């Protein structure tokens, strides 16, 4: 962050980032946010979404900013982590209606029993259907991860 801030100070540009680490030993999720939209954690057994919120300025804004790590413990098999750019919920159809976070969550909910790859494809297919070829103003980027049944000891997963 210090180097980036020095490089971009005069330009007014910045970069967002989310760093997420899943610790297999205790099934905990650790994250740091730097201005990026919060990731979502979906618990299908409780049918509950939660945003992985936390403070964090975009990278390059303040070279002295100290980022905080946040932790969530006790993730279970089937929990889904989705992190994307705001271009997903801001995707618009020809009438300029936004796709929305609610619709995004509903597609995840309806496909929660599938693999992470299949959930990702379902979201992109639904966005494509919704937008009907309308030109988008922002990038649409998504990563989906799903906690497995039988996690073996090993290195942490980093998203």
Say what each PLM segment does.
Residues 1-159:
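Conserved subregion of the PPM/PP2C metallophosphatase catalytic domain
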């Amino acid at each position: 962050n210090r180097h980036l801030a020095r490089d971009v100070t005069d330009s007014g540009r910045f970069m967002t980032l989310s760093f997420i680490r899943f610790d297999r030993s205790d099934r905990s999720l650790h994250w740091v946010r730097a201005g990026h939209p919060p990731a979502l954690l979906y618990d299908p057994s409780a049918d509950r979404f939660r945003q992985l919120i936390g403070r964090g300025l975009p990278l390059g804004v303040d070279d002295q900013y100290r980022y905080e790590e946040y932790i969530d413990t006790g993730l279970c098999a089937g929990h889904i982590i989705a992190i994307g750019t705001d271009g997903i919920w801001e995707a618009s159809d020809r009438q300029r209606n936004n796709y929305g976070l609610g619709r995004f969550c509903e597609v995840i909910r309806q496909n929660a029993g599938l693999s992470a790859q299949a959930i990702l494809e379902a979201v992109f297919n639904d966005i494509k259907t919704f937008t009907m070829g309308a030109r988008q103003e922002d990038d649409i980027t998504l990563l989906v991860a799903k906690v497995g049944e039988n996690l073996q000891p090993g290195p942490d997963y980093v998203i």
